[in-house]
Amino acid sequence: MKDKIVTFGEIMLRLSPENNARFTQCNAFEAVYGGGEANTAVSLANFDVDANYVTKLPKHINSLRQYGVGVDHIVRGGDQIGIYFLEKKTSQRPTNVIYNRAGSAFALATADDFNWDEIFDGATWFHFSGITPAISDTLAKVCLTACKKAK
């Protein structure tokens, strides 16, 4: 039997100027969906691990499903996902990142959104990063509840 690993975190939309341009120099952005916990789930799924991703999203599941990540416990709701703008470093300037995650579906998630008993059924490992409980007071409570349920 394969290990079942549950990851929990926010998937975000990264927008970066093309060709190492600065924000003020671009008319188009490269768009990539990702997030630490989602990336972990994708990597685990690539190694044939039963990887399951838990989050709250408006309507953005397909980018995970294509990698074989379990998305059965993604809660639907909210109006937006978190977005961040990444200006890539060059030899003459550092990386510049601007986050816009306030009011995202995940930032507004509450403990009542997730059925942790069902989510953790058969799970052998639970993974989330330190940023997740720091996003909002309610997410700190969600993480604490999840850890207690994970035992």
List where the protein language model places each region:
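Short beta-strand scaffold segments in enzyme catalytic cores
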Residues: V42, I83-E87
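Acidic, glycine-rich active-site loops and adjacent beta-strand->loop/helix elements
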Residues: K56-H60, G78-D79, K89, G103
